[in-house]
């Protein structure tokens, strides 16, 4: 699945100038798969998806739906979802390292009439899941286990009702419950009881997509979501390009002083990663919308910066790479990201370790990182089987000759084409 050979990160001695097309959004693809599955399971009919991302995370979601007895047809970015929830005996769902599968599929499995066992990669066993399982128990769903592996004993239906959950470790707890809530007999009310929610815009994305499927959702009260019971409308879904994956390429323009154009950039996206544009503009970058494309022209130089990434934690590795490559001596403070300690790896510890390994100066705080830009040296950059860490290493390698990413294959989680796209971007600029 992942490369075991170190990957020499391409060095860019001159500004990068490139046009890049990134595949569909992982967040949208996996949400549309679940919504399409629920519509089919209710007997409402089949749904189609175009622009779907095909990567390890989305393939794991497809396999999870198929394990539950649903049909997902199509081999590329065009998919059709149909069928009913009829799992085979001794059904097992492999979550891999995909948080969306780990947290979106169990409420769906609760609607089955059979036991479903969930497991995943070794690193996935450290990812937070207990609050979601406790919430399912609170809704009357028998669940064995407090973490991977665990078993959901479906009874064919879920009564629904009101459930309190501390989602401060992951907004996906809320999204996972909301996605299936309309299929519960009495609907669902979710009340967040913990500290400030991370990645709240991802919940807003879930709510918007539920409404597009005809679901009545009331989110007028902060930290409370009410999903009324009802049918999900089968429909055609069109996934936007994955803006989080695009961020690494935009960062290439910033750190090299070049120009990168992303094709198909949506004019009004529901993806939280669109907020990267505000960050890039504070770094003296020029952002232009040209027809259906987004173009970022990097500056000659930029200084350190302060940014709260609570709503866009997925951007942290790329933003940390930007901070490490800022003008020497300048300081960046990345805040609001304590929850990243429970992502694919402890991203705060990983970023601090890898930046410092190359001679940088990165310190952890209670909720983030403080990075003082210093000249970096060649060396190995560990990915920790984390796609975003691998991409961050590639960004650093643009300005530091001799950086090797130990596992660039980790990018297959959300962008299998990353090594090829990255190399083409750099090599296409060298002439």
UniProtKB/Swiss-Prot annotation:
Main localisation: cytoplasm
Cellular localization per UniProt: Cytoplasm
Reactions that this protein is recorded to catalyse: 3-phosphoshikimate + phosphoenolpyruvate = 5-O-(1-carboxyvinyl)-3-phosphoshikimate + phosphate
Gene encoding the protein: aroA
GO MF assignments: 3-phosphoshikimate 1-carboxyvinyltransferase activity
Organism: Mycobacterium ulcerans (strain Agy99)
Annotated active site: 314
PROSITE patterns: EPSP_SYNTHASE_1, EPSP_SYNTHASE_2
Entry similarity comment: Belongs to the EPSP synthase family.
Name of the molecule in the record: 3-phosphoshikimate 1-carboxyvinyltransferase
